[in-house]
Amino acid sequence: MDLGKLTALQLAEKIKQHQISVLDGVKYVFDQIEAKEDKVHAYLDTYKKEAYARAKEVQKGIEDGTYTGPLAGVPIAIKDNICIKGKTTTCASKILENFVPQYNAEVIDRLEEAGLVIIGKTNMDEFAMGSTTETSAYGVTRNPWDLEHVPGGSSGGSCAAVAAGETYLALGSDTGGSIRQPSSYCGVTGIKPTYGTVSRYGLVAYASSLDQIGPVGKDVADCAALLEIIAGHDAKDSTSMKREDLDFSSSMTDKIVGMIFGVPKEYLSEGLNPEVKEAFMNTLKSLTEMGAVVEFFSMKTTEYMIPAYYIIASAEASSNLERFDGVKYGFRAKEYEGLHDMYKKTRTEGFGEEVKRRIMLGSFVLSSGYYDAYYLKALRTKALIKKEFDQAFSKYDVLLAPASPFTAPKLGESLKDPLAMYLGDIYTVAVNLCGLPGITVPCGKDAAGLPIGIQMIGDCFKENNLFRAAHAYEKKRGDFGTAMEGGEKA
């Protein structure tokens, strides 16, 4: 049996039917890590010994009825900004190189209760600030489809691990597209849920009003099943929502007849790569052939989305990252004169360039002379963007957009021009500004064989519309193929 061809749900079903053991799946994943990790570098840390022990424990639990869920026994990787008790959590930053949390994030407790097996921690852009996983203090992650290209970011390690077969499932976090964009680059499926659906307790904060944890998987059904496990109210997170509609899997059918899709015309203007546009338009054609209605409309606030997002996100980041000062935990500069000098040198040496850039931008827009001109204006703009999305959802079930204007850039290209990297988030940031759910599904490849993803955006609490549409499209599209199949490009 080729375990690499199985989805997470299929693997769990084979385990339940006693065709394979939990340990078989875990061993398979570690075999893939051993074979590919030197090239891909998706992980910052792996827990082989603990995972093998956990596999035996879960196997016993499945047999005695303790673990009955649809993903029991499945290996999963965790982005390294999500706390696991007793395991280093670095956020891919030098300043947290030795930070070991004394508690689990809420999502970790839920995964363990559901019988999943945690494989390790994945690489990311430092403090989730970046779109390429190149700002990590611990080296770049490479795209499994072509090792000369980036996997996207900031959840690039999680998406690359799934694409390379180094895990079946992964958790990422999404602040401005950090699950959806790397999912597109790596040819996997990823969803950013409605804000407040998944507890942020134990997620190291970047921008608290925008951050949300979400699943990455091989297909839509895997992501729906994983979201059912991690979603739900948590009293430890003041922004956590009480929701009754957390059965996502039942919404998935092969039919989308009568669904109305909206496409913002501004999302197809200059800057969109022709090959990405062609794949996107072909997807619209497929949806129409399936009986859906696709209409174009104007989203006038599009040009304000990037500036509003980067002002708000950087402002919140500058506040959140004040806690990393070398006093209680993490890196501390070795040589300093007095307390203030220790703060200064610790943060100068501990933070990377991109993080410092965003802290400075955030501090600037929050400063007394510029607060009204920038931060307050950005908040008002955010409200106008949300109003326009509300108007769109009064007419459309789902909005469609490319996940990124281009396919995965070559390593090093994006770091030369940070502004261009920021502009690459044009199609994803509004989802976070408005607290909406969004899913990325592979829809094509460019001439070089790099994946292209389509993004489906839903109204708040309407993930079921996304799962229905994405699953139906996925069935029509057929098999997308696998990265590193028959040897990788290098």
What are these model-predicted stretches?
Residues 29, 51, 104, 223, ...:
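Residue-level signal for inorganic ion chemistry
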Residues 25-29, 308-309, 355-363:
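Short alpha-helical scaffolding segments that buttress acidic/His motifs in well-ordered protein cores
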Residues 71-91, 253-262, 315-386, 437-453:
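Short helix-loop capping/hinge segments that flank enzyme active sites or metal/cofactor-binding pockets
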Residues 72-213, 264-266, 315, 401-419:
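Short glycine/serine-rich loop/turn segments
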Residues 1-52, 289-291, 482-490:
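An N-terminal boundary/leader segment
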Residues 12-13, 301-302, 325-433, 483-489:
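Serine-dependent amide/ester hydrolase catalytic core
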Residues 35, 113, 164-169, 173-271, ...:
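Structural helix-boundary/capping segments
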Residues 41, 168, 397-399:
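Conserved acidic residues
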